[in-house]
From Swiss-Prot:
GO cellular component: mitochondrial membrane; proton-transporting ATP synthase complex
Complexes and interactors: F-type ATPases have 2 components, CF(1) - the catalytic core - and CF(0) - the membrane proton channel.
Organism: Wickerhamomyces canadensis
Similarity remark: Belongs to the ATPase protein 8 family.
Gene: ATP8
The protein's role, per its UniProt record: Mitochondrial membrane ATP synthase (F(1)F(0) ATP synthase or Complex V) produces ATP from ADP in the presence of a proton gradient across the membrane which is generated by electron transport complexes of the respiratory chain. F-type ATPases consist of two structural domains, F(1) - containing the extramembraneous catalytic core and F(0) - containing the membrane proton channel, linked together by a central stalk and a peripheral stalk. During catalysis, ATP synthesis in the catalytic domain of F(1) is coupled via a rotary mechanism of the central stalk subunits to proton translocation.
Protein name per Swiss-Prot or TrEMBL: ATP synthase protein 8
Length: 48
């Protein structure tokens, strides 16, 4: 089980943080604005 070998801790932390940063950028730049636009448009349509 390489997860328990201390030699691999730094490698797992590095790739974990890198993946977290990439996902954060992707969500904040692409996915969340689309969801927000959809939510706002539905809100305005329901108030008509």
């Amino acid at each position: 089980m390489p997860q328990l070998v201390p030699f691999y801790f730094l490698n797992q932390l590095t790739y974990g943080f890198l993946l977290l940063i990439i996902l954060l950028v992707l969500f904040s730049q692409f996915l969340l604005p689309r969801i927000l636009r959809l939510y706002i448009s539905r809100l305005f349509i329901s108030k008509l």
